[in-house]
Regions:
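Flexible loop and strand-edge segments within Gram-negative outer membrane beta-barrel domains
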Residues: 282-283, 288-289, 293-299, 313-388, ...
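Conserved C-terminal beta-signal and adjacent last beta-strands/turns
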Residues: 300, 307-310, 352, 490-494, ...
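Gram-negative outer-membrane beta-barrel transporters
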Residues: 403-405, 445-449, 554-556, 581-673, ...
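Short, acidic, small-residue-rich periplasmic hinge/interaction motif at the N-terminus
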Residues: 34, 50, 79-83, 93-138, ...
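Surface-exposed extracellular loop regions of Gram-negative outer-membrane beta-barrel proteins
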Residues: 323, 332, 369, 415, ...
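Outer-membrane beta-barrel translocator/receptor signature
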Residues: 204-207, 212, 217-288, 295-301, ...
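Short acidic/polar hinge/loop motifs at secondary-structure boundaries
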Residues: 185-214
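Outer membrane beta-barrel strand-and-loop segments of large Gram-negative receptors
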Residues: 305, 382-395, 434-436, 528, ...
Length: 744
């Protein structure tokens, strides 16, 4: 009933938005897109009319044309990989209009972020960000979201073999990093355990965006470490005339990898529909030491969406289904595999360029039904289910008293249950609600943003345990400074954020044998919330020959929650009375004596570090690039290292780029990680070599990209410090990958 009412509200909200140009006479808008450095036509560029949400690609000669454009004032943008995104104002009358556009080559800050209240270029973001799309996404594409992103500054990969993987941002993992799909939470259980993966095929993504550092203001308390947004556009929000889409096919030699993904939008200018699907399969992969048994995986997805698109508003819905299966290597009891299934239903409405004080709005409703079973051979050991409903409304107002901003509300209902041998928790209902405010004030050479968010979360567990409530405030203030003499080619970005996170469900209630984390885990229902105070400082520069960013950060967190190992005697002294907790009998430290007891504790901690990325243009075609990141985490009272911190890392690369051709390589240099906690095993440093070539061309208004990559070209034997199986398994050996993408 709640879902039906919310869906109806979204529909009414959308159709209530007026369309000012609906009855006006229509004409054409056409022009030529050229490259600023040489005046050559720009083929395959995406030209977008913001207010009408219309888009088209340029032909081989750089020309574009829109039909049926009502009279009015519009902002027209050009998006092309490797070029600065430009927006130009144009006035369209009753006769055909012409607008020629010029794009400038951009080495690094070429994309626009959608994760902020109002989309803004990377160069002008308050926090460090990363964006992968187009040719760059093809160059980085792997079988998981985490593996695809792991070469970006500040991002590492938590793994449990090859399939279960999740991004780690600045050393923060699990419930501190939010993964969303088209702005909505994925509804899976990858944050809870290392053997649970993110149920998204990265080949099906149109783009990926990452925010490094607290993103709690807009995305909730769980984004205290950062945010990953996977954009697939299952609900069309732009007017679509005819058809547009993307197809990706990839194959790899290691593990006999293969897969494909595609999505198509078709429409008549008023109604638009989305059809999408993907599939991938990987056999047992090989390391320099040989093949890894039971390391296979497969993924299949399907999605269907539709929307009504007006002149200034839209409303639509989509349905998606994900079916996965992957093996867990190195389990002595026999072959263990997981079979995640996820149903997702979304309703979304939005409007922009509206008359009145509210100039735009966005309303979303997402329903997720997730379940996976842990299979021991053909027998079901444990079944986990997670049902989730999430809703959000954001209203953005026109400038008033110098302020431009947004106000919004958010709610979440989650029902978690585990049944079987590893039923670590009683069934738990989680209800969260929040309200937030975000404002900006701008001057010629500076912009200030500030905002606040109030979150309330209630956990209601079964099993006779008491309900637990948390109410916390998060706030942030940030500044962008553009020195006048720099002509907008140098920016100083600074932000100070107070973020609060209530304990996660697993930190409060887990109790029992958990093979996914190689532990016997002991939750603590009395844990207090984490409260962090984080500071970010970023320096960004761009010019004809160099573009780059250096960022420094520090995060002081009170009551930092982590898994602390304890002895058998400590367990007996502190937890012996809970032997029948949740109707699950304990079995000591595991019958084989191989599982360590871990209890969730909270202690004050500090994390600090630095990130840098730069591109240097030696000549018109030869470009060097470098990436560096480091993070340190310590407990304040003892100065001990925090567990599972990524090692220092540097990447050096060189590429040749001429029009649509890129050929290059890079060396990934990772330091020894011996700053460990307790009995955590250290890892040696290593260097891996990566070679690639990519070519993009336009034919018949279709953009083709072919990418070849040789990963770990020297077949280096190395271990990922954040892989829970690192003591038993090195990482994947030499792999050749071929990726073909088609956009139209």
């Amino acid at each position: 009933m709640r879902i039906a009412l919310a869906s109806g509200l979204l529909v009414l909200l959308s159709f209530a938005a007026p369309g000012r140009a609906a009855a006006q006479a229509a004409t054409t808008l056409a022009g030529l897109v050229t490259q600023g450095e040489n005046g050559q036509p720009m083929a395959g560029a995406l030209v977008v009319i913001d207010e009408l949400r219309r888009e088209t690609r340029t032909d081989a000669d750089g020309t574009y044309k829109f039909e049926g454009i009502p009279a009015g004032e519009y902002h027209v943008g050009v998006r092309a990989e490797g070029y600065t995104t430009r927006r130009t104002e144009v006035v369209v009358g009753s006769t055909p209009a012409t607008l020629d556009l010029v794009v400038e080559f951009d080495l690094h800050f070429a994309e626009v972020l959608s994760v902020s209240p109002n989309p803004r270029p990377q160069f002008e973001s308050y926090q460090p960000t990363s964006v992968l799309t187009g040719q760059e996404l093809s160059r980085q594409l792997e079988s998981t979201v985490a593996a695809t992103l792991q070469s970006e500054p500040g991002i590492a990969m938590r793994a449990f073999g090859s399939a279960p993987a999740r991004p780690v941002i600045r050393g923060l993992d699990g419930d501190r990093v939010v993964v969303v799909e088209d702005g909505q939470r994925t509804g899976d259980l990858s944050a809870q355990s290392s053997d649970h993966g993110v149920p998204i095929n990265p080949a099906a993504a149109r783009r990926m965006e990452v925010v490094r550092g607290p993103a709690t203001l807009l995305y909730g308390a769980n984004a205290i470490g950062g945010l990953v947004n996977i954009i697939s556009d299952q609900i069309p929000s732009e007017k679509t005339l005819g058809a547009n889409g993307n197809f990706t096919f990839d194959m790899g030699t290691n593990g006999r990898q293969g897969g494909g993904a595609g999505d198509v939008h078709v429409g008549n200018g008023r109604w638009a529909f989305h059809f999408g699907g993907s599939g991938s399969r990987i056999g047992n992969y090989s390391t320099p030491e040989g093949e890894v048994e039971n390391s296979h995986s497969r993924t299949a997805t399907a999605s269907l969406g539709g929307a009504w698109t007006g002149e200034h508003s839209y409303v639509g819905a989509s349905y998606g289904y994900t079916d996965m299966e992957y093996g867990i290597p190195i389990v002595e009891e026999g072959q263990v595999s997981l079979d995640p299934r996820r149903h997702s239903f979304n309703v979304r409405a939005g409007g922009q360029a509206l008359p009145g004080f509210i100039q735009s709005y966005r309303a979303t409703l997402g329903v997720r039904r997730y379940q996976h079973s842990e299979l021991e051979g053909d027998e079901i050991g444990t079944t986990f289910s997670n049902d989730q409903v999430e809703g959000e409304v954001v209203l953005s107002h026109r400038k008033a008293a110098g302020l431009l901003g947004s106000v919004g509300g958010w709610l979440l209902n989650r029902q978690f249950e585990a049944l079987g041998e590893e039923a670590l928790s009683p069934p738990v209902d989680q209800n969260s609600v929040a309200g937030f405010l975000y404002e900006e004030v701008a001057w010629p050479h500076a912009t200030l943003q500030f905002g606040g968010r109030l979150d309330h979360t209630r956990y209601a567990p079964d099993g006779g345990l008491r309900n637990t409530d948390f109410t916390e405030f998060s706030g942030s203030v940030g500044a962008l400074i553009r020195p006048a003499a720099a002509n907008d080619n140098f920016v100083i970005a600074a932000s100070l954020a107070r973020a609060a996170r209530p304990p996660a469900l697993e930190e409060l209630y887990f109790y029992g044998r958990h093979l996914g984390n190689f532990a016997y885990e002991i939750g603590n229902p009395n844990l207090a919330p984490e409260r962090g105070l984080g500071f970010d400082l970023a320096l960004r520069a761009r010019g004809r020959r160099f573009e780059g960013e250096i960022s420094l950060f520090r995060n002081d967190i009170s009551n930092f929650i982590f898994r602390n190992p304890i002895s058998d005697d400590e367990f007996a002294a502190r937890h012996g009375e809970f032997d029948l907790r949740f109707n699950t009998e304990t079995e000591g430290n595991d019958p084989g004596g191989e599982l360590q007891y871990f209890e969730f504790v909270g202690r004050d901690a500090t994390l600090w570090g630095a990130e840098a990325h730069g591109d240097l243009k030696f000549t018109a075609q030869w470009i060097g690039e470098f990436t560096f990141d480091m993070v340190r985490g310590t407990l304040n009272d003892t100065n001990e290292n925090l567990p599972r911190m990524p090692p220092y890392r540097g990447i050096l690369g060189l590429r040749y780029q001429n029009a649509g051709l890129q050929v290059g390589g890079g060396v990934n240099l990772v330091a020894t990680q011996d700053r460990v906690y307790g009995a955590e095993a250290p890892t040696d440093g290593y260097a891996t070599l990566r070679l690639y070539g990519s070519y993009s061309f336009t034919k018949a208004r279709m953009l083709h990209t072919l990418t070849a990559r040789l990963e770990n070209a020297t077949n280096e034997l190395y271990r990922n410090h954040l892989n829970y199986l690192k003591d038993q398994l090195p990482e994947m050996g030499r792999t050749f990958r071929l990726v073909y993408t088609l956009g139209f």
